[in-house]
Amino acid sequence: MSEDHFDDELDGQGGGGSRHPMAARFRGYLPVVVDVETGGFNSATDALLEIAATTIAMDEKGFVYPDHTYFFRVEPFEGANVEPAALEFTGIKLDHPLRMAVSEETALTDIFRGVRKALKANGCKRAILVGHNSSFDLGFLNAAVARLDMKRNPFHPFSSFDTATLAGLAYGQTVLAKACQAADIDFDGREAHSARYDTEKTAELFCGIVNRWKQMGGWEDFDD
């Protein structure tokens, strides 16, 4: 299915009158920052262990900012692979008594409910995933949606905003920690590889780049 199909779908859903500034900024798409921590690199076989999502909002001057963060530790799905090296890298302890993990279905149902609420508040029709190396996060999100046979996924199935690419353009850095440093965003390496922390820092980075572009005159509030 082509990008043009989704563009036509969004245009067809638009009503009369002026659009919400956020909907006008991203052509009806709402940026939602997502980060996942996993049991490996294969979205079809490896466990989803943590997921966080931060919705993005816009102030009255047209500048964007991180709004609300949803975070869940997730139980590996039945038969999921978990690589020991992945646990060592992330520091996740599956048997920790305070981990309090939930099922994939519980996590995604709650996140999707919050995203749909944000879509309505911003006059948008579909969410677009923002991630640092976003294809990885979108791949695991889509794999979980397919496993659960979820019919109401608010995210675009293949388009995304990649902050590794955007940060490379804006700051000459593609590593999240270094990109944040270049953007004067505090980054604690001891907190890295937590889905919540990485999502919130990625959201700050994304908003900073979008706002910087606006300040430089790269985007004006118009509706074509």
Curated annotation (Swiss-Prot):
Known role: Trims short 3' overhangs of a variety of RNA species, leaving a one or two nucleotide 3' overhang. Responsible for the end-turnover of tRNA: specifically removes the terminal AMP residue from uncharged tRNA (tRNA-C-C-A). Also appears to be involved in tRNA biosynthesis.
Active-site positions on this chain: 193 (proton donor/acceptor)
Cofactor section: Mg(2+)
Annotated site, Important for substrate binding and specificity, chain positions: 41, 89, 136, 158
Alphabetic keyword roster: Exonuclease, Hydrolase, Magnesium, Metal-binding, Nuclease, tRNA processing
Encoding gene, per UniProt annotation: rnt
Binding positions for Mg(2+) 2 per the UniProt entry: 35, 37, 193, 198
Span of domain Exonuclease: 32-206
Keyword set includes Magnesium: yes
Protein source organism: Pseudomonas fluorescens (strain Pf0-1)
Pfam families: RNase_T (PF00929)
Signal peptide residues on this chain, from the entry's feature table: none
Quaternary structure note: Homodimer.
A GO MF label: RNA exonuclease activity, producing 5'-phosphomonoesters
Gene Ontology cellular-component terms listed: cytosol
Gene Ontology BP term (one): tRNA processing
Domain of life: Bacteria
Gene3D superfamilies: Ribonuclease H-like superfamily/Ribonuclease H (3.30.420.10)
Cofactor, free-text remark: Binds two Mg(2+) per subunit. The active form of the enzyme binds two Mg(2+) ions in its active site. The first Mg(2+) forms only one salt bridge with the protein.
Membership in a protein family: Belongs to the RNase T family.
SUPFAM superfamilies found in the cross-reference section: Ribonuclease H-like
Protein name: Ribonuclease T
Alphabetical list of InterPro entries matching this protein: Exonuclease_RNaseT/DNA_pol3, RNase_T, RNaseH-like_sf, RNaseH_sf
Binding, Mg(2+) 1: 35
Enzyme Commission numbers on file: 3.1.13.-
